[in-house]
Structure formats: C-alpha cells, structure tokens
Amino acid sequence: MTDIIRQLEAEQAAKIEEKRKLPDFQPGDTVRVQVRVTEGTRTRVQAYEGVCIARSGAGLNENFTVRKISYGEGVERVFPVYSPIVEGVEVVRRGKVRRAKLYYLRGLTGKAARIAEKKDNRTKAERAADKLAAAKAEAAKTAAE
C-alpha cells in the first residue's frame, strides 16, 4: 500500500519538476522565492527574499521556511515545495551553517543574526567550465523542445 502511494507521489513530483525546476538549497542559504499572489481578480508574482531556516517533510509534503526582517520585525513564511503558488526559487547566496534547523535565529538581532557566506574553493577555470556545461545543457534542452 505505501509502495503505491510512494510511487504516485514520485510521479506527481516528476511532473511538477518538469514544469518548474527548483535549485538545490539548504538551511542557511539566502533565497528569493517568486510567489504568485492573487488580489481580487488580478494575479501577480511577488518576490519574498530571506534566509531559509528549515526544510521539513518528504515527497509531495516537503516544505521550507524562509525568514526575513520586514520593517524591523521578523517574518517567517512556510512554502510547500510543490505548491502552485511558488513560481520559482533563486539562491542569492549560500550560507555556512552547522545545523539543519536555524530556529535560534529568532532570538538574535542585528549583526548577530547574520550567517557567514560559504566560500567556493574551486578555481576560476573550474567555475567557468561548470557554467559552460550548464549553458550547453540548457541549449540542448531548448533545442529538443
């Protein structure tokens, strides 16, 4: 029984991933989430930028929590990974943390709440090669469509 459920969830997740591929991100990363907002009859996309403080759940029930400071007040929002209101996620910067849940940030203010940026130890040539390979893969994908 659970095998069938797991298989159906995997199929649905693959179908959603086809339309909208989310980047790999983890707690500590600063992300910009493109959220679809409906006001009356109009629908628009709004950016919500903050630090990912947690990822929870698995399969279609996977969520991530993003925390930002708005007008001096901490605001947290939980987004389902496979929700249709999430148009896309962009990783702004990678954070260096040693925990999976960063709830301790709730009690910190100002500079104490900052997260160190993860350094990329690859050489410039390696980064350029990776970028070129990604561009070629994207071009091949576009040509196939």
UniProtKB/Swiss-Prot annotation:
HAMAP family: Ribosomal_bL19 (MF_00402). Keywords: Ribonucleoprotein, Ribosomal protein. One of its GO terms (biological process) is translation. The lineage of its organism: Bacteria, Pseudomonadati, Pseudomonadota, Alphaproteobacteria, Hyphomicrobiales. This protein is located at the 30S-50S ribosomal subunit interface and may play a role in the structure and function of the aminoacyl-tRNA binding site. GO terms for cellular component: cytosolic large ribosomal subunit. NCBIfam families: rplS_bact. This is Large ribosomal subunit protein bL19. InterPro entries: Ribosomal_bL19, Ribosomal_bL19_CS, Ribosomal_bL19_sf, Translation_prot_SH3-like_sf. PANTHER family: LARGE RIBOSOMAL SUBUNIT PROTEIN BL19M, RIBOSOMAL PROTEIN L19. The keyword Ribosomal protein applies. The gene is rplS. Belongs to the bacterial ribosomal protein bL19 family. One of its GO terms (molecular function) is structural constituent of ribosome.
